[in-house]
Amino acid sequence: MALQPAAGAKDLNPRQVETNRQLTERLASVYRLWGYDEVSPPRVERLATLMAGGAIDSSDIVRLVADDPLGLRPEMTASIARAACTRFADRQRPLRLWASGTVFRTRSADEGGQCIEENLQSGVELFGVSGSEAEMELLSLLMASVQTLGLQTSQKPRLLLGHTALMDLVLRPFNGAVRDQIRTALIDFDRLAIESFDLAYAEKTRLLSLMDCRGTPDQVLAQLSSLYGEQPVFDELRRLCTHLASAAQAQAVTIQLDPTFQPHFELYTGLVFQLVCDGRSSPVVFARGGRYDDLVRRCGATDDRAFGAGFSLAIDPIRELISDLDAAEQQQSDVLIAFSTASNLESAMERQRSWHEQGRTAVMALEPLSSMQEAELQAKAQGGLQLDWVDP
């Protein structure tokens, strides 16, 4: 029986690897323009760090058999926050960092047992900014990243915004286990669960209406103001969405506000967001982020520095969404250098060197071929390569 990769692991072909590299390099060039410095957090971390003080469930973490409780990172934010609060504690704030790398998560496989999901991510983290100016910079940077990726209007990119303060307003009348159950039902968009709770009719009706309360920021904030009166978070969101409107419109990104939108990771303590596109068969989340001040505080930051926010982009889904990654590079085919029986490998390799000096990819047919027609067939079989036939 042929050996197979572990469930959830991926064997990428050369084209996929090259596309991933181009995507990460494009994003890196944008991050650098905004003053972000690259870091490389470890793949292996202590479970205490990976669980982000309880914000990330241990069942999401791939554990390692070791003397110390170690695991593979399910995301990079916690590791970067730890480094920012220890190794980079003396650096000037705001501290701007970016990283790319593989993350690992576990889930239950359809046939039972555990499945390891392996994904490539690229993202940024901004530390030391307490106000909404951090979110304004990050979302502007996200729009610049979308621009360099070249998403199509037909993919209908949508930026979904939420805020923990909005969810707190919704959950304010409830306490204890009921509050947690309602929060889970709202996040999962589980109307049946809401209807099954032992709540007053008016409370059920309000919760069900809030599940449908998503749309343009102006519309949603007007509806929330009628329910809860004016709140400081409303002004913060208005300012943010007004600032973001022109950049989002330029990239054909629709902004939606949803008071019940929250990630399952209880990592965030302010604004949360996701960028979603229409995939081939279903919507695809390819960017997510938000503010995580509590995590920075757990990592040891003093109260005057315990501020952090960031986002990550999922490279693998982006690769599948984008078909025309780099038309300029695709217009030039790689070169196949083939030589006849009347020539020799040494002469062909001299020709190869001249192509390399021009910056072109050129590969060798290492054995002589009987005719140019045979060489043309080989070039076609290898993906339509341009033929350089060496025949004295």
Swiss-Prot record:
Tell me the first and last residues of the signal peptide: none
Assembly information from the UniProt record:
Heteromultimer composed of HisG and HisZ subunits.
Biological process according to GO: histidyl-tRNA aminoacylation; L-histidine biosynthetic process
Known role = Required for the first step of histidine biosynthesis. May allow the feedback regulation of ATP phosphoribosyltransferase activity by histidine.
Q: Which InterPro entries match?
A: aa-tRNA-synth_II/BPL/LPL (IPR045864), HisRS-like_core (IPR041715), HisRS/HisZ (IPR004516), HisZ (IPR004517)
Instruction: State the similarity comment.
Output: Belongs to the class-II aminoacyl-tRNA synthetase family. HisZ subfamily.
- Record's miscellaneous remark: This function is generally fulfilled by the C-terminal part of HisG, which is missing in some bacteria such as this one.
| Record-given protein name | ATP phosphoribosyltransferase regulatory subunit
GO molecular function annotations of the record? histidine-tRNA ligase activity
Organism listed in the record: Synechococcus sp. (strain CC9605)
Cellular component GO terms, alphabetical: cytoplasm
Gene3D superfamilies with a match to the protein in the record = Bira Bifunctional Protein, Domain 2
- Asked if the keyword DNA-binding belongs to this entry, the reply reads no
Q: Where in the cell is it found?
A: Cytoplasm
A Pfam family found in this protein is tRNA-synt_His
